[in-house]
């Protein structure tokens, strides 16, 4: 049988041509798909890298990581007798909006180690506001960074930037749910200038609530600041615990605390004593040969069935005759006391409602500026009323609070100081 070679060769050539075209199209399609896949994956990998950079994560499996904190802001309406205005503020240093990174790891039975990093927002610090300054602050501030080693039987030792043993020991006895909102520290209103008649003076309200221990116009909690140091806390035994600390350079503190229930009452007690000899604890220096000691005691009593409560604080600062750098004047010994009473009841399904009144006096807490103005004694008084509504579903509190402060000054032509009034409306939400 004879084959037509020409015809057969043409058919083979045609088949090869078609196969080549199909193969080329398939290769092109495969290359295109690969290119699209690479572009897609590259975008996805970039996004994953972005998320990894911003995600909170545990550094290892042994140590836990908890992120917590709160946001607290208020609108403060103030009246100095002539001028009126409204500012949006935070709650003051050490109580400002913050977030905390806390870690813990179990080492052995009854033993653990951990750390704490606390960063606060000081961008709207009320202690820096006055008639001419509506917004002031330093922005984010690393308030605490420390590690600790804890034993259930022996207690806990902490090293780093931390609250020392007696910091706020009297103030933190307040379990009413209003401690951040209303306390005896002059967090708001202290930087405003005094007004005598219609004239503004160079002196401020905080010049009559001055603490030499920390060289700031705190009013109360005079040695209440964090610093680099070492702190020891004992285990709680039947509700009682003790603390001791050393901070640079030099600050020694001891404190005792109790919390419990006695005869149908919730009880919280605290007392502390500190000695500070660091002229540069918070620059600029104000003292020659500083030697400030501060004693504080506080308590809280709440009747469990009715919700009626009382919170009380006493503080006394002794400066042992130290002289101020400017003018060579003697730093006065001073004291303060504070009462807050009210009721805490759940009248609403939202959560507890707290209604309270407060009163405090700050005696002879004269700053270097007040001493140089000729003041020899003073009595700054402050009273207020407030209400707080807790919202349990959001771990949130909202409040309204009114305060008035007055001052009587001895030894200087400073009679007729006009009272300062302010009303605050705000909220705090935990996370």
Regions found by a protein language model. Give the residues of each.
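Outer-membrane beta-barrel and related beta-rich outer-membrane complex signature
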Residues: 81, 127-129, 169-178, 283, ...
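Beta-barrel outer-membrane channel/assembly domains of diderm bacteria
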Residues: 3, 31-167, 225-226, 230-235, ...
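Solvent-exposed loop/turn segments connecting transmembrane beta-strands
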Residues: 222-227, 243-254, 331, 377-379, ...
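Bacterial N-terminal signal peptides that target proteins for export
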Residues: 2-15
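Surface-exposed coil loops of outer-membrane beta-barrel proteins
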Residues: 83, 87, 126-138, 158-243, ...
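C-terminal segment of classical bacterial N-terminal signal peptides
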Residues: 19-30
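Detector for outer-membrane/organellar transmembrane beta-barrel domains
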Residues: 255-390
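Transmembrane beta-strands of outer-membrane beta-barrel proteins
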Residues: 65-73, 109, 113-117, 157, ...
């Amino acid at each position: 049988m004879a084959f037509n070679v020409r015809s057969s060769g043409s058919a083979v050539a045609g088949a090869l041509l078609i196969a080549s075209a199909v193969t080329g199209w398939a290769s092109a399609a495969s290359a295109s798909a690969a290119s699209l896949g690479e572009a897609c994956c590259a975008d996805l990998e970039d996004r994953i890298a972005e998320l990894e950079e911003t995600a909170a994560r545990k550094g290892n499996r042994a140590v836990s990581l908890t992120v917590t904190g709160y946001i607290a802001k208020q609108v403060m309406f103030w009246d100095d007798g002539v001028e009126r205005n409204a500012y949006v503020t935070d709650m003051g240093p050490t109580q400002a909006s913050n977030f905390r990174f806390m870690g813990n790891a179990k080492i052995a039975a009854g033993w653990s180690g951990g750390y704490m990093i606390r960063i606060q927002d000081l961008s709207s610090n009320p202690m820096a506001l006055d008639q001419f300054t509506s917004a002031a602050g330093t922005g984010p501030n690393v308030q605490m960074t420390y590690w600790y080693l804890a034993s259930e039987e022996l207690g806990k030792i902490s090293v780093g930037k931390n609250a020392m043993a007696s910091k706020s020991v009297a103030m933190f006895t307040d379990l009413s749910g209003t401690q951040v909102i209303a306390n005896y520290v002059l967090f708001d209103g202290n930087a405003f200038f005094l007004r005598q008649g219609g004239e503004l003076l160079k002196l401020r309200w905080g010049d009559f609530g001055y603490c030499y221990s920390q060289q700031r116009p705190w009013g109360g909690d005079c040695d209440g600041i964090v610093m680099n140091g070492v702190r020891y806390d004992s285990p709680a035994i039947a509700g009682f615990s003790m603390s001791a600390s050393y901070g640079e350079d030099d600050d020694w503190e001891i404190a005792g605390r109790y919390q419990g229930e006695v005869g149908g009452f919730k009880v919280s007690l605290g007392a502390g004593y500190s000695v500070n000899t660091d002229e540069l604890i918070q620059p600029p220096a104000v003292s020659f040969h500083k030697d400030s000691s501060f004693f504080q005691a506080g308590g809280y009593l709440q009747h469990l069935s009715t919700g009626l409560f009382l919170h009380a604080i006493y503080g006394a600062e002794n400066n042992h005759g130290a002289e101020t750098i400017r003018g060579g004047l003697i730093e006065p010994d001073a004291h303060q006391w504070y009462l807050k009473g009210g009721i805490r009841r759940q009248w609403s399904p939202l959560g507890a409602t707290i209604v309270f009144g407060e009163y405090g006096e700050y005696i002879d807490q004269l700053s270097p500026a007040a001493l140089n103005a000729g003041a020899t004694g003073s009595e700054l008084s402050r009273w207020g009323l407030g209400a707080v509504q807790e919202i349990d579903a959001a771990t949130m509190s909202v409040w309204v609070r009114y305060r008035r402060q007055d001052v009587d000054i001895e030894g200087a032509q400073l009679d007729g100081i006009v009272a300062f009034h302010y009303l605050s409306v705000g909220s705090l939400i935990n996370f």
